[in-house]
Amino acid sequence: MSENVEQTQTKKLELKYDIYQPFGPSVLKVRMPQQFVNSLNVEGDRILHDEKLSKEHDWSHNLAGNVKKEVMIDVNKIPRIREFLGSMSQAYYRHTIKQEPAPGSKVAFRSWIVSQYAGDFNPMHIHDANLSGVAFLKMPPGFDEEYAKEDHHKTAGCLEFLGSMPNHFANHSYLVKPEVGDFYLFPSWLTHQVYPFRSEGERRSFAFNVHFTMDNPVKGVDV
């Protein structure tokens, strides 16, 4: 909801009005602390740069992406990352459900790192969870220049959320230009995709699913 003031030209009336957005999903955005980005990149380097580990951790058969590598990582082995994910998931829950999670509820995470190069993309898809999220860890050195040179709809390397059918007076998509450290959390059923890019170098992101387990589920929350 936003409060606005409009002055009419004919009668010089000052009219206060509100605009509500009562429908549609919410997307949480926060800046991930640099030390967390560093920790995830260290773990990513450890697996991605080792062919044996890359094969052992390969998660691509469970995902939709047409990308270089997708490898599973265990955030339980990086406590501060797990705590951060838990904190953001609880914040999203409180904001959307308007109450605290039920006593005894638990949160579980499944996470992976996506390593993309020129021409790689991720088609439209959804996730099988309650919430899903992404954090951007690396971008190709020439990406900003490539993005700036696009002379029409700028989509290179972007993440796009697709929320509804196109219609008048309603946004049906939300385009995100990736910035290292930006973190997004959203409902797992929200369709999204990643566009290809041409720049040399790696576009690396951290992706995850959130599963809530509750002793006393809240009405309207599918767990």
Spans of features found by a protein language model:
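Short, charged beta-turn/beta-strand-edge "cap" motif at the junction between a beta-strand
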Residues: 190-193
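Catalytic core of non-heme Fe(II) oxygenases with the double-stranded beta-helix
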Residues: 109-185, 195, 202, 212, ...
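A domain-level signal for the structural core that forms small-molecule/cofactor-binding pockets
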Residues: 205
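Residue-level "micro-hotspots" composed of small/polar
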Residues: 104
